[in-house]
Amino acid sequence: MMEGQQHGEQLKRGLKNRHIQLIALGGAIGTGLFLGSASVIQSAGPGIILGYAIAGFIAFLIMRQLGEMVVEEPVAGSFSHFAYKYWGSFAGFASGWNYWVLYVLVAMAELTAVGKYIQFWYPEIPTWVSAAVFFVVINAINLTNVTVFGEMEFWFAIIKVIAVVAMIIFGGWLLFSGNGGPQASVSNLWDQGGFLPHGFTGLVMMMAIIMFSFGGLELVGITAAEADNPEQSIPKATNQVIYRILIFYIGSLAVLLSLMPWTRVTADTSPFVLIFHELGDTFVANALNIVVLTAALSVYNSCVYCNSRMLFGLAQQGNAPKALASVDKRGVPVNTILVSALVTALCVLINYLAPESAFGLLMALVVSALVINWAMISLAHMKFRRAKQEQGVVTRFPALLYPLGNWICLLFMAVVLVIMLMTPGMAISVYLIPVWLVVLGIGYLFKEKTAKAVKAH
């Protein structure tokens, strides 16, 4: 009985430094790069490389802000805890629930992408069927224990990293050995209408989709409560992940866009698979499709982990039903995994009803939730830093360029929202932000009223 109580509300610290680095890396190397980059290439051309560098810098600032807070206070629920403690109870409530919804939407987008990748081999299989099968498999794995999740995500991410590095090396060899055919040349980066064929506007208009690619880096913060040694592992993961991401994103896209003119890229297929398919290398195209499928499953796996831990943190704060604040004897928050899975299952229905537009719609909703998420991290960090300065505390892992870095991030978020308002198909998700904030407000008032009623009794 004592043992049951001891484990009743505690997550196990079963994640090592290698797990944490690859969870964050795996969270970012996914559908945004492998599938989302297609529409960016069509609009921005080779300028996509500059776009990823800009968004990568913003993502790094956000990660360092979150990293500073997490190293000081490694807790479940990550930044919703900081918003709650340093900003106010509504901020904690809103940021936590927004993050949970964000990752439910990301999970839906990744499952949709899985369906598209399966169609590369089996065009007759509807996306909703593939989504349903992998939905069941990944959730079943997450119901084991955190170390199994960590190991699986570690190997998923290793496959992605090796594949991206191998693709950069193999693509480079094709490029410089002359085996890539007459169209393979570094001059493709500026010959087809210039580096920015549609001007700087073409690139700016794509920043929202590029931002989608970097969503997932903040998973480092969520892992803190289950990290063996957060004071060492979080700073190391934060600093190393961003350099690797930029090398992978910028390196792979530079090689890719040199192998073939950017004008040949189509929106529905991964440009990585398409280019090797067009070069006539069916083996590499098939191998890469396995990799992009693994990438989507890896991010979905991270989503299942992340959603359940965020909901667990919300329940511990009293912002979600108390039943969700329990774990089984292995330290697995089974209830939160099942609740998150139930909502994510809507993805199968969306793919059944609107298979063609499902991915675009989900991606737009993800970016809106991500804007709220990153803005709240930046704002919560400013309040956290002020509180620490007033207490005379010198933090161990200070964020870069504080407070200027925070204002740069907030300006970037505002620009992304304006871009989305001007983008057909994306504007609806921006209009939904005030609606979503009202829903959160009603939920918060209901929670407060219920809490008061319980106290009165």
Swiss-Prot record:
Q: What protein name applies here?
A: Aromatic amino acid transport protein AroP
Q: Which residues form a coiled coil?
A: none
Q: Where in the cell is it found?
A: Cell inner membrane
Identify the main location.
Answer: membrane
- What InterPro entries does the record tag this protein with? AA-permease/SLC12A_dom (IPR004841), Amino_acid_permease_CS (IPR004840)
Any S-S bridges, and between which cysteines? none
**Spans through the membrane:** 20-40, 43-63, 87-107, 118-138, 156-176, 202-222, 241-261, 272-292, 334-354, 359-379, 408-428, 430-450
Keyword Cell membrane listed? The answer is yes
Query: What does this protein do, in the record's words?
Result: Permease that is involved in the active transport across the cytoplasmic membrane of all three aromatic amino acids, phenylalanine, tyrosine and tryptophan.
This protein's membrane topology, according to the annotation, is:
Multi-pass membrane protein
This enzyme catalyses:
L-phenylalanine(in) + H(+)(in) = L-phenylalanine(out) + H(+)(out); L-tryptophan(in) + H(+)(in) = L-tryptophan(out) + H(+)(out); L-tyrosine(in) + H(+)(in) = L-tyrosine(out) + H(+)(out)
Topological domains annotated Cytoplasmic: 1-19, 64-86, 139-155, 223-240, 293-333, 380-407, 451-457
